[in-house]
Amino acid sequence: MAHRLQIRLLTWDVKDTLLRLRHPLGEAYATKARAHGLEVEPSALEQGFRQAYRAQSHSFPNYGLSHGLTSRQWWLDVVLQTFHLAGVQDAQAVAPIAEQLYKDFSHPCTWQVLDGAEDTLRECRTRGLRLAVISNFDRRLEGILGGLGLREHFDFVLTSEAAGWPKPDPRIFQEALRLAHMEPVVAAHVGDNYLCDYQGPRAVGMHSFLVVGPQALDPVVRDSVPKEHILPSLAHLLPALDCLEGSTPGL
């Protein structure tokens, strides 16, 4: 007779799964620039940030830790390059803006808890599930979660900066399992990124659920993920867990 699967550990992505920026990034950057006497279009800053972040992540992955950078310096460089790409060539004028933005994005008021997130976390705890965070965030995450009243829900918060490996590297998931003293078969991960949050945990034998944001899911991703693993909202998580636990392990 087959044993019933029981999930005991739920690990969570944070950005765009539990939290999001209170204001669009381009607007936040433009507002801070305006306070320092610079007028820059939010759309140009948004586009510049995407390019700068992608290039920095490629050249210095995981905050450049293996290159001797700190996450703070990594982010300051991203902001400087963002403004450069948006047409601001005066790095000296941007430097204090970058410093202030780093502080602002460390503050809980810059972020907002997504609808249903706190209720879902509370219901998971009521069920007896252990909860933890696995995030590609930096060292500021603990303070942000604490300021928003979410830290108390988690046994531990594991960032890629602390672990030394970013998702989807299998080692960050293995480290979380080690910290929790759990086997992968009784653990599941929840997040919004297909590679980092869906495929990554499955590579080490965990289960996973993909949270769908306001944008339509890429057709290739949609076709490769069973519909019972897709969460249109966090309110769908507990029913999806019930469905998973009603299945036969290994099938």
UniProtKB/Swiss-Prot annotation:
The record's section on SUPFAM superfamilies has: HAD-like
List-wise, which residues carry N6-acetyllysine? K15
In-chain residues carrying the UniProt-annotated modification N6-succinyllysine? K15
What the entry lists under InterPro entries is as follows:
HAD-like_hydrolase_domain, HAD-like_sf, HAD-SF_hydro_IA, HAD-SF_hydro_IA_REG-2-like, HAD-SF_hydro_IA_REG-2-like_cap, HAD_sf
Q: Which residues form the signal peptide?
A: none
Instruction: Report the GO terms under cellular component.
Output: intracellular membrane-bounded organelle; mitochondrion; nucleolus; nucleus
Is Acetylation a UniProt keyword of this protein?
A: yes
This protein's record includes keyword Phosphoprotein:
no
- Write the record's keywords in alphabetical order, separated by commas: Acetylation
The entry sums up its family as follows:
Belongs to the HAD-like hydrolase superfamily.
Which PANTHER family does this one have? HALOACID DEHALOGENASE-LIKE HYDROLASE DOMAIN-CONTAINING PROTEIN 3, PTHR46191
This protein's name: Haloacid dehalogenase-like hydrolase domain-containing protein 3
Q: Name the gene for this chain.
A: HDHD3
